[in-house]
Amino acid sequence: MGKEMSRRSFLKAGTAAAIGLSMTPGSMFAGVDAKKKKKGVKDGKLKILGVGIGGRGAAVLRGLETEDIIGLCDVDWKYAAPIFERYPNAKKYNDYKVMFAELLDQCDAVVCATADHTHAIICAEAIAAGKHVYCEKPLTHSVYESRLLTKLAAKHKVATQMGNQGASAEGVRQTCNWIWNGEIGEITKVEAFTDRPIWPQGLERPAEEPAVPSTLNWDAFIGPAPMRPYNPIYTPWNFRGWWDFGTGALGDMACHILHPVFKALKLTYPTKIQGSSTLLLSESCPNAQVVKFTFPARDNMPKLAMPEVDVYWYDGGLKPERPAGLPAGVDLNVQGGGVIFYGTKDILVCGCYGAKPYLLSGRKPEVPNLCREVTLSHQQDWVRACKEDPEVRVPSASDFSEAGPFNEMVVMGVVAVRLQGLNQELHWDGEKMEFTNIPADATIRSVIKDGFSIKDGHPTFNKTYTDPVNARQFAAELIKHNYREGWELPAMP
């Protein structure tokens, strides 16, 4: 593999840091020299910059009001107006590049909660400058971007956190502890779902081209994506449903719902993946989709073997079959989704964020705690990590050493859906970030417009397709985007 550190290596390092330092339930910093730990903590408040503050960013910032928020940026000043008013001492911007040019060297940390497609370029610049980073989920828009942020964070030894707040909650810890203690036995199948999307998907590109509002910096919103005319269907909020800007229900919610799966089963790269959906359009994510990930066997734990496992994802109203023994009337949807772990001894069910886990047998076993207990909020756990010396830092609950590889898995599902027209199971080489079984001459196309109509009781099917493109090249662009001119990521460490 050469000089590059593998995803498996990063994951093992992250797991060791997050679990191995805190095996004693009563001590957050077990195994760390107390005097050295105290010396490493910085006094005073963090100076924080916020990018993307009108939506999820507002909630994140409210959890950071113990610190000094010195600069705020949002491309939409109408949407962000209440947040600007809440922090009157922070300088205001509508272009993060301008804010970074003026304030990046003065800050300690950056919060990023912009549209998905700009997460990587904002976070990468901040990390390369040695700044701590909190980034909303999904961490990035592509596999390559996730790998880059993982390696940059390790290189620059900054504290990081992805905004999947369930990672700091009790449900994920309980799920991991039960599974790691062997309570449900070996797991070879997991099914998960969300009730999303709750934003528009399955849309064609709008024909209307209204004027850009004076309060919106459209060029900054587009960022590294290809330029297109403004339409209010894209932003705010609705970016999630458009391929150029978002990752659909899978990207938006799997970072919450699949996190206990990734963590408890110590997943690494999938080796095989396939996706299907309702009508697949070239511009917008489908209304409903199913993805199957296959992961190879992992190293066994003392009380648990880790065989090959299939993980299934459903969204858009689709759900897995109810497990045998689940009482009638019990809703698997808890806080927006659910997960079913099928073990050889029992079945474990939990909700979105890992919430309210239970065993189908009704047992409530008392087991050793092998996870660090997070007594702070998700944001404040990151603040704690920011203020610790890198040599003794206990990683936050969703540090990029774990969140980066995890997000690769999530956006791999998005790629599989977009490649479903190949009509094959896709084989994945995680180290190289490439598919190994797409034929060299394979082509792929997608629907631009669905011209279905009914006249006098007779249906007409008249779809307009994109021109066929080489499937390998198309897949490569989904894995590593070609940014538009003027936008560039740092080199991969």
Say what each PLM segment does.
Residues 52, 60, 156-162, 166-275, ...:
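Predominantly a Rossmann-like dinucleotide-binding segment in NAD(P)-dependent oxidoreductases
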Residues 1-18:
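N-terminal secretory signal peptides and thylakoid transit peptides that target proteins
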Residues 110-111:
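N-terminal Rossmann-like NAD(P) cofactor-binding module of classical short-chain dehydrogenase/reductase
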Residues 115-116, 120-168, 182:
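Beta-strand-loop-alpha-helix segment that lines the small-molecule cofactor/substrate pocket
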Residues 91-95:
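Short acidic-hydrophobic, aromatic-tinged amphipathic segments that line or gate anion-handling sites
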Residues 38-39, 65-66, 70-73, 79-80, ...:
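Glycine-enriched catalytic-core subsegment of oxygenase/oxidase enzymes
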Residues 17-87, 166-169, 261:
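N-terminal Rossmann-like dinucleotide-binding module
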Residues 99-105:
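Short amphipathic alpha-helix with an adjacent loop that forms part of the alpha/beta core around
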